[in-house]
């Protein structure tokens, strides 16, 4: 079976055959895809917490309440739900930050949360609890089984499109409507 190139800095789009799973109509940003496996963050499944409520949980006083006022925290995936991951742009210099591509970074440090509370963090953020993970080769097998479509990174999809529209918009970038999708793979 032929293996796909690295999917880092791409999006996965859930296919209709995942409707009975945790990943129903999800879009996932792939943070890492290497010889150890794949790690991604769901960018369109909302948690019941908002960003200000999360900051309050850490006893951080929000000095700029208009920042992120109604922004929901997202469910990044079913793994490690008590850990937070923040995708943001620009990258900046945070304590525990992983620079990605296109001036995007993922940060997991409290100094970023403090910057969010005091209004000095970047405006473009996506806050997730938990992540999605696959063992080496597992995601490639799922793509071959027609569980996922892939598209390159798109800043607007990550930061600007409303969460409830991201799946549809992601499909539209491929010229696909949900009604035209089949659950059958197009190969043997």
Swiss-Prot record:
InterPro entries found in the cross-reference section: AlgH-like
Pfam families: DUF179
Coiled coil spans: none
Origin: domain of life: Bacteria
GO CC terms of this entry: cytosol
Similarity remark: Belongs to the UPF0301 (AlgH) family.
Protein name: UPF0301 protein Tcr_1827
